[in-house]
């Protein structure tokens, strides 16, 4: 191919690409300015620029529409009004307010479904001007939270994996940095995870997790070394076992002492009963007038002897009964 022809073809392709980048289907403009706002807040969309604002007085009709994409052939009408006519705008949807003085569209309590392309058309007698912009809504990011997801200790070093998370926010980007450092830490693919290997020389290190999206940012600091300190319960389990063993021994000693005390009380009661046993000797003699008659019976003892062993009452705890023996000598009456 002729070099001049090749150059001409290249120029034509360049113009085609430039035209396609500026216009979509039906000649719609593609390079719409992008407006970023916070989700849920009131949004004001300036649907104009200086040149359109100057020619607004010559317009006979204004239409504001919204589309989910520039390639979509269907648009939702939001505002339709004639500047020369008095009265409120027509077809004004809920939560919308149009300010004619500066051609600004207000959206109350913005929602995700409000995202899209907003187009304003100014119709004149013989011409039409169009202006568009793209609205993107983002949820504000909350304060991040840093947690230790994994910890290992070996040879005096501590290896940690930190995780940084947020409860609220979309399209969130994460970055890590050290408070005393001059250069940010760069985990793989700006991950919310950070791996650290620390030693005693890093005891004062403080790390910062920063979260951000196109409309907001927030950060949180974290000192990991306190979580790496040696836990006595982990490194000295023998102390726990020694304490348990000592407790068991003390319980056994107390049980033995109680048993010995009970046996001592029982022996004391038995000894006391034996010591306090009394023997009573009683002698009974018949009246005097019979003394003469009894002389004829020298072999018989005129006296009666009674032996009685008396004991004190036995405590209730002692169930053994003591027997009482009575020895009596009885003489026969005189016939």
Swiss-Prot record:
Modified-residue entries (Phosphotyrosine), positions: 281, 307, 327
Domain Ig-like V-type: 29-138
Extracellular side: 21-237
Annotated GO MF terms: antigen binding; identical protein binding; SH2 domain binding; signaling receptor activity; transmembrane signaling receptor activity; virus receptor activity
Residue window of motif ITSM 1: 279-284
Top-level taxonomy: Eukaryota, Metazoa, Chordata, Craniata, Vertebrata
Subunit (UniProt): Interacts (via cytoplasmic domain) with SH2D1A and SH2D1B; SH2D1A mediates association with FYN; SH2D1A binds to phosphorylated and not phosphorylated ITSM 1. Interacts (via cytoplasmic domain phosphorylated on tyrosine residues) with INPP5D and PTPN11; presence of SH2D1A facilitates binding to INPP5D. Interacts with MAP4K1. Interacts with PIK3C3, BECN1 and UVRAG; indicative for an association with PI3K complex II (PI3KC3-C2). (Microbial infection) Interacts with measles hemagglutinin protein; this interaction allows attachment and viral entry into the CD150-expressing immune cells.
Main location: membrane
Gene: SLAMF1
UniProt-annotated site: Interaction with measles HN protein, residues: 29
Resulting phenotype, residue 29 to S: Reduced infectivity
Chain positions of motif SH2-binding: 307-312
Keyword Transmembrane helix: yes
Tissue: Constitutively expressed on peripheral blood memory T-cells, T-cell clones, immature thymocytes and a proportion of B-cells, and is rapidly induced on naive T-cells after activation. Activated B-cells express isoform 1, isoform 3 and a cytoplasmic isoform. Isoform 4 is expressed in B-cells, primary T-cells, dendritic cells and macrophages. Isoform 4 is expressed in tumors of the central nervous system.
Spans traversing the lipid bilayer: 238-258
Name this polypeptide is given: Signaling lymphocytic activation molecule
Subcellular localization, as worded in the UniProt entry: Cell membrane
Keyword annotations: Adaptive immunity, Cell adhesion, Cell membrane, Disulfide bond, Glycoprotein, Host cell receptor for virus entry, Host-virus interaction, Immunity, Immunoglobulin domain, Innate immunity, Membrane, Phagocytosis, Phosphoprotein, Receptor, Repeat, Secreted, Signal, Transmembrane, Transmembrane helix
Disulfide bonds: 158-228, 164-209
Gene3D superfamilies: Immunoglobulins
């Amino acid at each position: 191919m002729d070099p001049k022809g090749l150059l001409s073809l290249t120029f034509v392709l360049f113009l085609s690409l430039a035209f396609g980048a500026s216009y979509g289907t039906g000649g719609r403009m593609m390079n719409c300015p992008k407006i970023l706002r916070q989700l849920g807040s009131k949004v004001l969309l300036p649907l104009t620029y200086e040149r359109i604002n100057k020619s607004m007085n010559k317009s006979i009709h204004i239409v504001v529409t919204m589309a989910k994409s520039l390639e979509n052939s269907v648009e939702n009408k939001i505002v339709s009004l004639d500047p020369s006519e008095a009265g409120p705008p027509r077809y004004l949807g809920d939560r919308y307010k149009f300010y004619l003085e500066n051609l600004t569209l207000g959206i109350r309590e913005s929602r995700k479904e409000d995202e899209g392309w907003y187009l304003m058309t100014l119709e004149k007698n013989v011409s039409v001007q169009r202006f568009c912009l793209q609205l993107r809504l983002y949820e504000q990011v909350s304060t991040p939270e840093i947690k230790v997801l994994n910890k290992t200790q070996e040879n005096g070093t501590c290896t940690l994996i930190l995780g940084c998370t947020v409860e609220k926010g979309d399209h969130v980007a994460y970055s890590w940095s050290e408070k005393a450092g001059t250069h940010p830490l760069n985990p793989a693919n700006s991950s919310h995870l950070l791996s650290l290997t620390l030693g005693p020389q890093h005891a004062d290190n403080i790390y910062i997790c920063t979260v951000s999206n196109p409309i907001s940012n927030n950060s949180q600091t974290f000192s990991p070394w306190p979580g790496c300190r040696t836990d006595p319960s982990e490194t000295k389990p023998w102390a726990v076992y020694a304490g348990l063993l000592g407790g068991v021994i003390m319980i056994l000693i107390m049980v033995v002492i109680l048993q010995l005390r009970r046996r001592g009380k029982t022996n004391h009661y038995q000894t006391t009963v034996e010591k306090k046993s009394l023997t009573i000797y009683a002698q009974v003699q018949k009246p005097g007038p019979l003394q003469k008659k009894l002389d004829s019976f020298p072999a018989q003892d005129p006296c009666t002897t009674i032996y009685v062993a008396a004991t004190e009452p036995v405590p209730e705890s002692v169930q053994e009964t003591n027997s009482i023996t009575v020895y009596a000598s009885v003489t026969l009456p005189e016939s």
